Protein backbone atom coordinates (compact mmCIF):
# COMPACT_ATOMS: atom_id res chain seq x y z
CA UNK A 1 0.00 0.00 0.00
CA UNK A 2 2.70 2.48 0.99
CA UNK A 3 4.59 1.81 -2.26
CA UNK A 4 1.48 2.49 -4.35
CA UNK A 5 0.81 5.66 -2.39
CA UNK A 6 4.41 6.82 -2.84
CA UNK A 7 4.32 6.19 -6.60
CA UNK A 8 1.07 8.10 -7.01
CA UNK A 9 2.58 11.12 -5.32
CA UNK A 10 0.26 14.12 -5.45
CA UNK A 11 -2.04 12.67 -8.10
CA UNK A 12 -5.76 12.73 -7.37
CA UNK A 13 -7.45 9.73 -8.94
CA UNK A 14 -10.93 10.09 -10.44
CA UNK A 15 -11.76 6.57 -9.28
CA UNK A 16 -10.19 5.37 -6.02
CA UNK A 17 -8.29 2.08 -5.98
CA UNK A 18 -10.26 -0.57 -4.11
CA UNK A 19 -8.02 -2.38 -1.64
CA UNK A 20 -8.60 -5.80 -0.10
CA UNK A 21 -5.83 -6.50 2.42
CA UNK A 22 -5.02 -10.19 2.77
CA UNK A 23 -5.22 -12.23 5.95
CA UNK A 24 -2.67 -15.05 5.83
CA UNK A 25 -2.39 -18.43 7.51
CA UNK A 26 0.49 -19.33 9.81
CA UNK A 27 3.21 -21.23 7.93
CA UNK A 28 1.39 -20.35 4.72
CA UNK A 29 2.06 -17.97 1.88
CA UNK A 30 1.27 -14.26 1.65
CA UNK A 31 -1.02 -12.22 3.87
CA UNK A 32 -0.88 -10.50 7.24
CA UNK A 33 -0.63 -12.97 10.10
CA UNK A 34 -1.46 -10.88 13.16
CA UNK A 35 -4.81 -9.25 13.89
CA UNK A 36 -3.26 -6.04 15.21
CA UNK A 37 -1.13 -5.64 12.07
CA UNK A 38 -4.16 -6.14 9.83
CA UNK A 39 -6.27 -3.62 11.75
CA UNK A 40 -3.37 -1.16 11.67
CA UNK A 41 -3.24 -1.38 7.86
CA UNK A 42 -7.02 -0.95 7.57
CA UNK A 43 -6.70 2.15 9.75
CA UNK A 44 -3.94 3.58 7.53
CA UNK A 45 -6.07 3.00 4.42
CA UNK A 46 -9.21 4.40 6.01
CA UNK A 47 -7.49 7.52 7.34
CA UNK A 48 -5.52 8.25 4.16
CA UNK A 49 -6.13 11.89 3.25
CA UNK A 50 -5.51 11.49 -0.49
CA UNK A 51 -8.88 9.78 -1.03
CA UNK A 52 -7.16 7.68 -3.71
CA UNK A 53 -7.92 4.44 -1.88
CA UNK A 54 -10.98 2.65 -0.60
CA UNK A 55 -10.95 -0.17 1.92
CA UNK A 56 -13.24 -2.52 -0.02
CA UNK A 57 -12.95 -5.79 1.85
CA UNK A 58 -10.79 -8.70 2.92
CA UNK A 59 -8.98 -11.34 0.91
CA UNK A 60 -7.58 -14.69 2.02
CA UNK A 61 -6.56 -18.11 0.77
CA UNK A 62 -7.90 -20.92 2.90
CA UNK A 63 -6.37 -23.69 0.80
CA UNK A 64 -2.94 -23.14 2.30
CA UNK A 65 -4.43 -23.41 5.79
CA UNK A 66 -5.55 -26.93 4.97
CA UNK A 67 -2.05 -27.79 3.77
CA UNK A 68 0.00 -25.95 6.39
CA UNK A 69 -2.22 -26.75 9.36
CA UNK A 70 -3.75 -30.03 8.13
CA UNK A 71 -7.33 -30.67 7.15
CA UNK A 72 -10.78 -29.13 7.29
CA UNK A 73 -10.56 -28.34 11.02
CA UNK A 74 -7.67 -26.02 10.18
CA UNK A 75 -9.86 -24.31 7.57
CA UNK A 76 -12.56 -23.76 10.20
CA UNK A 77 -9.93 -22.31 12.55
CA UNK A 78 -8.67 -20.01 9.80
CA UNK A 79 -12.22 -18.86 9.02
CA UNK A 80 -12.74 -18.13 12.72
CA UNK A 81 -9.59 -15.99 12.70
CA UNK A 82 -10.87 -14.05 9.69
CA UNK A 83 -14.33 -13.60 11.21
CA UNK A 84 -12.80 -12.31 14.44
CA UNK A 85 -10.73 -9.74 12.55
CA UNK A 86 -13.68 -8.63 10.41
CA UNK A 87 -15.85 -8.08 13.47
CA UNK A 88 -13.17 -5.80 14.97
CA UNK A 89 -12.83 -3.53 11.92
CA UNK A 90 -14.36 -0.13 12.80
CA UNK A 91 -17.61 0.22 10.85
CA UNK A 92 -16.80 3.77 9.73
CA UNK A 93 -14.26 2.28 7.31
CA UNK A 94 -16.96 0.43 5.37
CA UNK A 95 -20.36 1.88 6.37
CA UNK A 96 -20.40 4.08 3.24
CA UNK A 97 -19.99 1.05 0.94
CA UNK A 98 -22.86 -0.68 -0.84
CA UNK A 99 -21.30 -3.98 0.20
CA UNK A 100 -18.14 -5.36 1.79
CA UNK A 101 -16.30 -7.97 -0.24
CA UNK A 102 -14.88 -11.06 1.45
CA UNK A 103 -12.98 -13.27 -0.94
CA UNK A 104 -11.18 -16.55 -0.42
CA UNK A 105 -9.35 -18.74 -2.89
CA UNK A 106 -8.98 -22.47 -2.93
CA UNK A 107 -10.61 -25.44 -4.58
CA UNK A 108 -11.00 -28.09 -1.92
CA UNK A 109 -12.76 -26.34 0.97
CA UNK A 110 -14.90 -23.74 -0.78
CA UNK A 111 -18.03 -25.22 0.79
CA UNK A 112 -16.77 -24.42 4.29
CA UNK A 113 -15.72 -20.91 3.30
CA UNK A 114 -19.01 -20.17 1.55
CA UNK A 115 -21.09 -21.36 4.47
CA UNK A 116 -19.03 -19.60 7.15
CA UNK A 117 -18.63 -16.23 5.47
CA UNK A 118 -22.23 -16.02 4.27
CA UNK A 119 -23.31 -15.93 7.93
CA UNK A 120 -21.26 -12.84 8.83
CA UNK A 121 -23.52 -9.94 9.82
CA UNK A 122 -22.33 -6.35 9.52
CA UNK A 123 -23.96 -2.96 9.02
CA UNK A 124 -23.60 -3.37 5.24
CA UNK A 125 -24.31 -6.41 3.05
CA UNK A 126 -21.51 -8.94 2.61
CA UNK A 127 -20.55 -10.26 -0.82
CA UNK A 128 -18.67 -13.56 -0.63
CA UNK A 129 -16.49 -14.25 -3.65
CA UNK A 130 -14.99 -17.72 -3.99
CA UNK A 131 -11.89 -17.96 -6.16
CA UNK A 132 -10.84 -21.28 -7.58
CA UNK A 133 -7.28 -22.16 -6.78
CA UNK A 134 -6.79 -23.41 -10.33
CA UNK A 135 -6.54 -21.82 -13.73
CA UNK A 136 -9.70 -22.37 -15.86
CA UNK A 137 -10.39 -25.96 -14.82
CA UNK A 138 -9.65 -28.52 -12.12
CA UNK A 139 -7.05 -31.26 -12.38
CA UNK A 140 -8.70 -34.67 -12.27
CA UNK A 141 -6.62 -36.60 -9.73
CA UNK A 142 -6.00 -34.32 -6.74
CA UNK A 143 -9.47 -32.79 -6.78
CA UNK A 144 -11.23 -36.12 -7.07
CA UNK A 145 -9.22 -37.20 -4.02
CA UNK A 146 -10.22 -33.98 -2.23
CA UNK A 147 -13.85 -34.57 -3.17
CA UNK A 148 -13.77 -38.08 -1.71
CA UNK A 149 -12.29 -36.63 1.48
CA UNK A 150 -15.08 -34.05 1.61
CA UNK A 151 -17.74 -36.75 1.08
CA UNK A 152 -16.30 -38.81 3.92
CA UNK A 153 -16.70 -35.86 6.32
CA UNK A 154 -20.30 -35.98 7.57
CA UNK A 155 -20.08 -32.35 8.70
CA UNK A 156 -19.56 -31.14 5.13
CA UNK A 157 -22.65 -32.92 3.69
CA UNK A 158 -21.22 -33.37 0.20
CA UNK A 159 -23.54 -35.24 -2.15
CA UNK A 160 -22.43 -33.89 -5.52
CA UNK A 161 -19.49 -34.46 -7.84
CA UNK A 162 -17.24 -32.12 -9.76
CA UNK A 163 -17.99 -32.11 -13.47
CA UNK A 164 -15.19 -32.03 -16.08
CA UNK A 165 -15.23 -28.62 -17.77
CA UNK A 166 -12.40 -29.00 -20.27
CA UNK A 167 -11.41 -31.88 -22.53
CA UNK A 168 -8.37 -31.79 -24.81
CA UNK A 169 -7.97 -34.13 -27.77
CA UNK A 170 -4.60 -35.15 -29.16
CA UNK A 171 -3.08 -37.52 -31.68
CA UNK A 172 -0.99 -40.44 -30.47
CA UNK A 173 2.33 -39.74 -32.17
CA UNK A 174 4.22 -42.86 -31.17
CA UNK A 175 4.01 -45.96 -28.98
CA UNK A 176 7.66 -47.05 -28.88
CA UNK A 177 7.26 -49.39 -25.92
CA UNK A 178 4.51 -51.12 -24.00
CA UNK A 179 2.85 -48.68 -21.59
CA UNK A 180 4.60 -45.68 -23.18
CA UNK A 181 2.78 -43.35 -25.57
CA UNK A 182 3.78 -39.93 -26.89
CA UNK A 183 1.04 -37.46 -27.77
CA UNK A 184 1.11 -34.36 -29.94
CA UNK A 185 0.52 -32.16 -26.92
CA UNK A 186 2.39 -31.17 -23.81
CA UNK A 187 2.49 -28.91 -20.80
CA UNK A 188 2.07 -25.82 -22.98
CA UNK A 189 -1.24 -27.22 -24.27
CA UNK A 190 -2.49 -28.65 -20.98
CA UNK A 191 -0.89 -26.84 -18.04
CA UNK A 192 -1.61 -28.42 -14.68
CA UNK A 193 -1.68 -27.27 -11.09
CA UNK A 194 -1.19 -30.47 -9.13
CA UNK A 195 -0.74 -33.89 -10.69
CA UNK A 196 -0.26 -34.68 -14.37
CA UNK A 197 -3.18 -34.52 -16.85
CA UNK A 198 -5.11 -37.78 -16.85
CA UNK A 199 -6.04 -39.65 -20.05
CA UNK A 200 -9.75 -40.53 -20.07
Sequence positions of predicted segments:
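Catalytic beta/alpha-barrel core
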Residues: 1, 22
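Active-site loop/helix belt of alpha/beta enzymes
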Residues: 7-18, 24-156
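Charged (often Lys/Glu-rich) extended helix/loop segments that serve as interaction or gating elements
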Residues: 136-200
Amino acid sequence: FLNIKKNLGDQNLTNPINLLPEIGAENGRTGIRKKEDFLKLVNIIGEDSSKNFTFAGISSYEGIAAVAMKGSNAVHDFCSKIEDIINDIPSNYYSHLNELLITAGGSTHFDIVGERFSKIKLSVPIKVLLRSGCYITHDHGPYLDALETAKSDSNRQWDQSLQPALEIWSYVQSIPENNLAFLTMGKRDAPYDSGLPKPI
